[in-house]
Amino acid sequence: MYPRGVKRSQHDRHKQTAFRTIKRSITHRPTSKFISHFAKNFRGKLAPLKQLDESRLDALSLTELEQLKTIIEEKQQEKRAQNNAITFLPNLPTVPFADTNFSIKSLGLRPYNGDARDPKQRIRDRFPQTHERICLLTNDILETDLLLRYRQCLDSLTREENQQLMGDRIFSLTNSPCLAFTVATVEEACSYFKFHDLHNLPVNPQDLFMYTITVMKFEFFNKLNMAKLTCVFNDNGHGDIEYRKLRQLCGKPVLDREMPNSEFEVQQQTPDSFRHPIQQAMSIVVTFARILRQIKEHIIRTKKPQFIRDFDTERVAERYECGLISRLIGKQFSNHKCDDVSCQNRIERIMAPWKPSLFFCTYFAKDAPKFKLFPNLPHEYRNLSFTCPKVDMEPSCSYSTSRDLPQTSHRSHKNQGTPKVKSKVCVEKPDTSNLTTTKTTTEILIEESMETDNKIPDPRELNFNQAKQDEIVIININENVNSKHESESSVEMDLDLDYEADTCETNLNTYSSDSE
C-alpha cells in the first residue's frame, strides 16, 4: 500500500492491469478490458480443449461416435508411424546400408578357411547341426571375412525373411534356458558391433544383430535379476544402492529410494566408472544400444550412411574385447563368498541350463501328435515327431465291459467262513499258424473299450444294464451267504504302517548338504 497522498505511477498501473488480464484469461473469466498479446495466444491454445466437452460428446449418436473413434484411431496410427519411423525405416534407401564398395583387400581381411559352415547355410538352417563348430577364436572373428559374409547375407534378405529371422532370435532370447546362453548371445552381437567399429563399416539398423541389442539389454537384466544381486553387490558394501544403480542403468524404475544421480546421468557414465563387474558388463551393452539409437535417428534425418566412430565419443567399442562380458560375469559370481545358501543356489541355477523333468509319457503311438517344423530346416530335422514306444498292455485309464471280463466269484462283505476256491479262467490261445489275422485278447479289449468310449449311450440301455448289474450282485450275495468264510487273520493283509511312516517322513534339516 502506498502512503496517503502519493499517487501510483502510470507504469505500475499498466503492469498491474496486464497481470490481472492474464490471470482472468487463465481462469477463463470474461473480461471487458483489453487483452494482451500473450493472453490472446494462450486463449487460442485452449480453444481446442474447450471443444472436448462431455455434454457435446453425450449429444452425439452412436454412428457419430463410431466415426469419431475411427478418426481417432487413424490419427493414432499416423502418430505411431511417425514415432516408430526409426524402427520400421519405411522411406530409407538401401544405399546407406550397402557394403558393395568394401572388399576383403580394402578392409585388410583374410579369407576364412576354418571348419565353420557357410553363412548362407547357417542363416537358412537357423540353428547349428550336430557336432558343428560354432566356437571361434578372436582372430577368426575380427581378422577374417566371415562376419563380412554374414553382413552381405543379411543385407540380401527380403523384408519378410528378415522379420522372420528377427522374430526367431527375439523368441530364443526371451525363452533363454540359462544365463550362459544369454551371455553368449550378447557376446555375439557385441563382437559383430566391434567388427563394424574396427573396420569402419556403415551400420544397418535393420540388421539381425544390431536390431536386437535393445532386447538383449532387458533380457540380460532379467537373467541377472534371478540371482540375489543385493547379496552379490554387498561384497564392497552398500549392496542395495549398487543394485538400484544397476536398475537405473538398464532403465528400470527405482521408486522406493532417492538416488544421488538420475537415470540419464547413470546411463551416460563409462563402464570403467562402475565398481562391480556386472555393472560394467551392463554398461557396455547399454552404451552400444544408445549408439545404435542415435545412428537410427541420424539415418532417418540425413538419409546418409552412419558409422559407429562418429557416435562413440568414449571409445567403448574400441576398448571392448571379444568375450569381455562373459569374463566380467564369471569374475563377479566366482569371487562372491557369502553364508547365504539361497544366494549360492540361485547362482548355480542361473549359470546351469534348466533340465526338463518328464518322467513318463501320456501319449500312445496311435494318438501321438506330430509337430510340423519350419520348412527351411535341414533335411535330417524335417521328419521329427513326438512319439512314444508301442504299449503292449492295456492302459490303466481304459475299461472293459462286464461281459468281456473273466467271471470270478465275488467275496462276501462278511468276515466269516472258509476260503473259497478261485475259479480258473480259460482263455483260448491264438493260432500260431495264422498270426497275420489273429489278434491278442488285449488288443480286442482295447478296441472294444475305444468303441464303447466313442459310442453315445442310450438312457434305456443304461437303465437295463444297471438293473442287470443289481440282479447279478444280489445273486452273488445270496450264494455266498450259505458258504463258509475264511478267517480274518488268514485273508486280510496287514498294512506295514511303520514302514509307510518312515518313508513319508519329511526331514526338515536338509540344508546341511547344501551348505557343504
UniProtKB/Swiss-Prot annotation:
Zinc finger motifs (CHC2-type), residue ranges: 231-343
Presence of keyword Glycoprotein: no
GO biological process: regulation of DNA-templated transcription
One MF annotation (Gene Ontology) recorded for this entry: zinc ion binding
UniProt cross-references to InterPro entries, sorted A to Z: ICP27-like
A Pfam family this chain is assigned to: Herpes_UL69
Gene Ontology cellular-component annotations: host cell cytoplasm; host cell nucleus; viral tegument
Record: residues binding Zn(2+): C231, H336, C338, C343
Keyword Transcription regulation in annotation: yes
Principal cellular location given in the protein's record: virion
Domain of life of the organism encoding this protein: Viruses
Keywords from the named record: Host cytoplasm, Host nucleus, Metal-binding, Transcription, Transcription regulation, Virion, Virion tegument, Zinc, Zinc-finger
Cell compartments where the protein resides: Virion tegument; Virion; Host nucleus; Host cytoplasm
UniProt feature, compositional bias: Polar residues: 399-409
Positions of the UniProt region annotated as Disordered: 399-423
Family: Belongs to the HHV-1 ICP27 protein family.
Primary role: Immediate early (EI) protein that plays many roles during productive infection including regulation of viral gene expression and nuclear export of intronless viral RNAs.
Protein name: mRNA export factor ICP27 homolog
Organism, as annotated: Human herpesvirus 6B (strain Z29)
